[in-house]
C-alpha cells in the first residue's frame, strides 16, 4: 500500500497525524490498531491527514489544527467505482477560488509538505511534461498516490505524493513525487472529484497526464547560441513550422499541443542516460569529435527512456516559450528528423524505410496531441503517406500499430549503426598495424648489422614429428612449427619468400628441390607454407595485392591469428641453415660454426637480408631469456614480450571462434581445440607436478619393497615353515592311535590306555641300520 504516515520516520514529520481512513476515526487509536485498520480497509483508500503548519498566523483561532491534507489512492479499478461514493469521507468546507494561471504561477509542493519558505523567483521557473501511461487492461493500476489540500489556502491543485516502485508509472520513470497534475486526458482538473472520475473510467486504457514541476538546473545548459548552431547543422525547416504552430495556438494550450520529434532536456532523473545516449544534440567541439573514442566506436548505448518511441514526447516550457525552448535530439531523433541526411546515407536502410520512419513519427505526434491528420506537415499529408487512417477506428489501436512499426525500424537502425562502428574500429586497428610494420621495416633497413646474438634460432624445445596438434597452446606449442604467412602489405614478405622456409631442413649443402605446387583455391590462407622460389613469392605477393580493396586498403579475406604482426615477428629467415640449441657454454663455438657455414665459400651461405631485417624488426619487442630443459641444461632464447603476444593471441582466437558452430567444427579439417587462459595453464602445471611427484613416490616405494625382499634373510622363513610342518605332524600322529588298534599298530606303536593318557611300550623294537 505504501502508506508511511502513521509511523514517524523523520523529525520534521512529527507533526503528521492521521485522522480518518474511509470515514473511520483513527486519531484516538494506537499504532497497532491503526495498522490493523489500514490492512482491513477495502480499496479505494481515502486518508485524511492533519498536520501543524510551521508558519503560525496571528488571526488564527486554532492552535493545533492549522492545515489538513487529504490523499486518495488513484489505482482505482472499475469494480470500486460504486464503493467510492459510499466510502467518501466528510471533508471540511472548501473555499472555491479561481484556478491559478497555468503558465506563470506555481506553488512548490515542498512548501506545504516540508514547511520550507516560499521563494519569490519560483513563479516563472516551471517545467511542463506530458506523460502517457499505457495499461494492457482496465484492471491494471497506475500506482500513483495523489494528494490535495483541504484547508483555506488558495492552492487547490492535485499533486503526486508517492509512486509505487513496481507500478506502470514507476516503470515509465517520468513522473516524480511532488509533480502537480494539470490535465488528465486533455481535461483540466481542479479537485479530487474530477481526478477520480476521469481515472476511474473503464474505457481509458491510455491515460495522458500533464504535470508541472520546478525547472531543473540541467535545462539551463543550452543557450541561444547553442540552439542556433544546432539548427545550422541539421536544418531549420521544422523550426519555422513549430514557430508558426505555436503562434496560432493559445497560450494556455501550448503545453498540450506542441510536440517535437526529438527529446528535449528532461529533469534530473533522466539527465545521465540522455548524456550517454545522445551524441547529436550537443554542438561543442569535444562532443562532435566524440566518435573517435573507442567507447563510442564499440556502440555501447545504455537503455534509457529516450530510446523508446513513447519517450519522444517531452517538452520544457518557461516564461517566454519562443526564446527559451531547448532542443535535445537523441540518436532516434537524428533518424526521425532527417538531420540533413538522406536515406542513402544510412547504410542498410533504404530510402523508402527512411521516409516511412519520418512519416510515422510525425503521424504519431499529431495523433497523440488529438489533432486531425489534415494538420500534418505538408510532406506527411501528401500522397506519399502509406498509412491509411480510419476515423472510426479507436485511437489506441492506431497508436499501437505505429508503436510496433517504429520499434521495428529503430531496432534495425541501431543494429546498422552498431555494425558500422565495429567495422570502423577494425579498419583503424588494421591501418595502425600496417603503419607499424612499414615504420619498423624502414628502421631495420637503415641500421647496420651489429647484433651479435641475432642468429640465435628460436625453435621449439621438443620436436615431435608425429604430433598433429592444430593449435599452439599449452604443450602443443613446442611440438608443431607454425606455418604462417605475414601480412600481405608487410615488407617482410619479400625477404621471407626468397630466403626462408619454415619447413625444417637438416644442415648440409643446398639441394635443388622442385617448387611446391600451388595450393587449391579452397584451402585457407593460414595453411599455405612459404615457398622458397623468389618468383613464386613475388607472384603470390602480387595476387595478395590484387585482392585488396582499393578503397579501404584492407584484404577481403579473413586474416588468421597467425598473420598478426605480433605473431609474424617470431619467424625469421632461416634459409638452408640447420637448427641449433644454444647453451651458455656452447654459445661461442656454435656461433663460429654458424659463421663458417654462412661464409662466402659455403654452399649453404646465401643472402641473409631477410634474417637481418627480421631480427632488427623484432628487436624492440623481443627479450633474451635463459631457458631450462627437462634434463637440466640451459640455453639462451629470444622471446617476444609476453603481454603483447598473449593479448594479440587471445584477441585473434576470440575473433576466429566467434562465428564457429558445432557443425562447422565437425566439417572442418582443422580442429580448433580449446583455448586455455594463463591461470588455467598454471593450474594444469601445478596438477601435473603433483601427479608426477605421486608417481615417483609410488615407484620408489615399490623399488624399496622389492629390494627388501631380495636382500632379506630367508632362515626365519624356513624355520617358521619347519615349525609349522612339525606341529602339523604332531597333530596327525595323535589322531592315528584310537580305540581301534590293529596288530601292526600294536607291534609298531604299542598299546594306549583307555583314557588315552598313557602309551605302553611296543612289543617289537625295530632298528633300521
From Swiss-Prot:
Residues 282-298, 447-467, 530-547 have a biased composition (Basic and acidic residues). The modification Phosphoserine is found at residues 236, 454. Residues 221-315, 445-579 are annotated as: Disordered. Changing residue 39 to C: In a breast cancer sample; somatic mutation. The keyword Phosphoprotein applies. Residues 229-239 have a biased composition (Acidic residues). InterPro entries: E3_ubiquitin-PDZ_ligase (IPR051971), PDZ (IPR001478), PDZ_sf (IPR036034). It comes from the Eukaryota. It is found in: Cytoplasm, Cell cortex. Residues 389-419 form a coiled coil. CDD domains: PDZ2-PDZRN4-like (cd06716). Residues 130-214 form the PDZ domain. Residues 468-479 have a biased composition (Polar residues). It holds the Pfam family PDZ. Keywords: Coiled coil, Cytoplasm, Phosphoprotein. SUPFAM superfamilies: PDZ domain-like (SSF50156). Brain-specific. Expressed in fetal and adult brain. Up-regulated in synovial carcinomas. One of its GO terms (cellular component) is cell cortex. This is PDZ domain-containing protein 4. The lineage of its organism: Eukaryota, Metazoa, Chordata, Craniata, Vertebrata. The gene is PDZD4.
Amino acid at each position: 500500500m505504501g502508506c508511511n504516515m502513521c509511523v514517524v520516520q523523520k523529525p520534521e514529520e512529527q507533526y503528521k497525524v492521521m485522522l480518518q481512513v474511509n470515514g473511520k476515526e483513527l486519531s484516538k487509536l494506537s499504532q497497532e490498531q491503526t495498522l490493523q485498520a489500514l490492512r482491513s480497509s477495502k480499496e479505494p483508500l481515502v486518508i485524511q491527514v492533519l498536520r501543524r503548519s510551521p508558519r503560525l498566523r496571528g488571526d488564527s483561532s486554532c492552535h493545533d489544527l492549522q492545515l489538513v491534507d487529504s490523499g486518495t489512492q488513484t489505482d482505482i479499478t472499475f469494480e470500486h467505482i460504486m464503493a467510492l461514493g459510499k466510502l467518501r469521507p466528510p471533508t471540511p468546507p472548501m473555499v472555491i477560488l479561481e484556478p491559478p494561471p497555468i503558465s506563470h504561477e506555481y506553488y512548490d509542493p515542498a512548501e506545504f509538505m516540508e514547511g520550507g519558505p516560499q521563494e519569490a523567483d519560483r513563479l516563472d521557473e516551471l517545467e511542463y511534461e506530458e506523460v502517457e501511461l499505457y495499461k494492457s487492461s482496465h484492471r491494471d493500476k497506475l500506482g500513483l498516490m495523489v494528494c490535495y489540500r483541504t484547508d483555506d489556502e488558495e492552492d487547490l491543485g492535485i499533486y503526486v505524493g508517492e509512486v509505487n516502485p513496481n507500478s506502470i508509472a514507476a516503470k515509465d520513470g517520468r513522473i516524480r513525487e511532488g509533480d502537480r497534475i494539470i490535465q488528465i486526458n486533455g481535461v483540466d482538473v481542479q479537485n479530487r472529484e474530477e481526478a477520480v472520475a476521469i481515472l476511474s473510467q473503464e474505457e481509458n486504457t491510455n491515460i495522458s497526464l500533464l504535470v508541472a514541476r520546478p525547472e531543473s538546473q540541467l535545462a539551463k545548459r543550452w543557450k541561444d547560441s547553442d540552439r542556433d548552431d544546432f539548427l545550422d547543422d541539421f536544418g531549420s525547416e521544422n523550426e519555422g513550422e513549430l514557430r508558426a504552430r505555436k503562434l496560432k495556438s493559445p497560450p494556455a494550450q501550448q503545453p498540450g499541443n506542441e510536440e517535437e520529434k526529438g527529446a528535449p532536456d528532461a529533469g534530473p532523473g533522466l539527465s545521465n542516460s540522455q548524456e550517454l545516449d545522445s551524441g547529436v544534440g550537443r554542438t561543442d567541439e569535444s562532443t562532435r569529435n566524440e566518435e573517435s573514442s573507442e567507447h563510442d566506436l564499440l556502440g555501447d548505448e545504455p537503455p534509457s527512456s529516450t530510446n523508446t518511441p513513447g519517450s519522444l514526447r517531452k517538452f520544457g516550457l518557461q516564461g517566454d516559450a519562443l526564446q527559451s525552448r531547448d532542443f535535445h535530439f537523441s540518436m532516434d531523433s537524428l533518424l526521425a528528423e532527417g538531420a540533413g541526411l538522406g536515406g542513402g546515407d544510412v547504410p542498410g536502410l533504404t530510402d523508402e524505410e527512411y521516409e516511412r520512419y519520418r512519416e510515422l513519427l510525425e503521424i504519431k505526434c499529431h495523433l497523440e496531441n488529438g489533432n486531425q491528420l489534415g494538420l500534418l506537415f505538408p510532406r506527411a499529408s501528401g500522397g506519399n503517406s502509406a498509412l491509411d487512417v480510419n476515423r472510426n477506428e479507436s485511437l489506441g489501436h492506431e497508436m499501437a500499430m505505429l508503436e510496433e512499426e517504429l520499434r521495428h525500424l529503430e531496432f534495425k537502425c541501431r543494429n546498422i549503426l552498431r555494425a558500422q562502428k565495429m567495422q570502423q574500429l577494425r579498419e583503424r586497428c588494421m591501418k595502425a598495424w600496417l603503419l607499424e610494420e612499414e615504420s619498423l621495416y624502414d628502421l631495420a633497413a637503415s641500421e647496420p648489422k651489429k647484433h651479435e646474438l641475432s642468429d640465435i634460432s628460436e625453435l621449439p624445445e621438443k620436436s615431435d614429428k608425429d604430433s598433429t596438434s592444430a593449435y599452439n597452446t599449452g604443450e602443443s606449442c613446442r611440438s608443431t612449427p607454425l606455418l604462417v604467412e605475414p601480412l600481405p602489405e608487410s615488407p617482410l614478405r619479400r625477404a621471407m619468400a626468397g630466403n626462408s622456409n619454415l619447413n625444417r631442413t637438416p644442415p648440409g649443402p643446398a639441394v635443388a628441390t622442385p617448387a611446391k605446387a600451388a595450393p587449391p583455391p579452397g584451402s585457407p590462407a593460414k595453411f599455405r607454407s612459404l615457398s622458397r622460389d623468389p618468383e613464386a613469392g613475388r607472384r603470390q605477393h602480387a595476387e595478395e595485392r590484387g585482392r585488396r580493396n582499393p578503397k579501404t586498403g584492407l584484404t577481403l579475406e579473413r586474416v588468421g591469428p597467425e598473420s598478426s604482426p605480433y605473431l609474424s615477428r617470431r619467424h625469421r629467415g632461416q634459409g638452408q641453415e640447420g637448427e641449433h640449441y644454444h647453451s651458455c657454454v656452447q654459445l661461442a663455438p656454435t656461433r663460429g660454426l654458424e659463421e663458417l657455414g654462412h661464409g662466402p665459400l659455403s654452399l649453404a651461405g646465401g643472402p641473409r637480408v631477410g634474417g637481418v631485417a627480421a631480427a632488427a624488426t623484432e628487436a624492440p619487442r623481443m627479450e633474451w631469456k635463459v631457458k631450462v630443459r627437462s634434463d637440466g641444461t640451459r640455453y639462451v632464447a629470444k622471446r617476444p614480450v609476453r603481454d603483447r603476444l598473449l593479448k594479440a593471441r587471445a584477441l585473434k582466437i576470440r575473433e576466429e571462434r566467434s562465428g564457429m558452430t558445432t557443425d562447422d567444427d565437425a566439417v572442418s579439417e582443422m580442429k580448433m581445440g580449446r583455448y586455455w587462459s594463463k591461470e588455467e595453464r598454471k593450474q594444469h602445471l601445478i596438477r601435473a607436478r603433483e601427479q608426477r611427484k605421486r608417481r615417483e613416490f609410488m615407484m620408489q616405494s615399490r623399488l624399496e619393497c622389492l629390494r627388501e625382499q631380495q636382500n632379506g634373510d630367508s632362515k626365519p622363513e624356513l624355520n617358521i615353515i619347519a615349525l609349522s610342518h612339525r606341529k602339523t605332524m604332531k597333530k596327525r600322529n595323535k589322531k592315528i592311535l584310537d580305540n581301534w588298534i590293529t596288530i601292526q599298530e600294536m607291534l609298531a606303536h604299542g598299546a594306549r590306555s583307555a583314557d588315552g593318557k598313557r602309551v605302553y611300550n611296543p612289543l617289537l623294537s625295530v632298528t633300521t641300520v
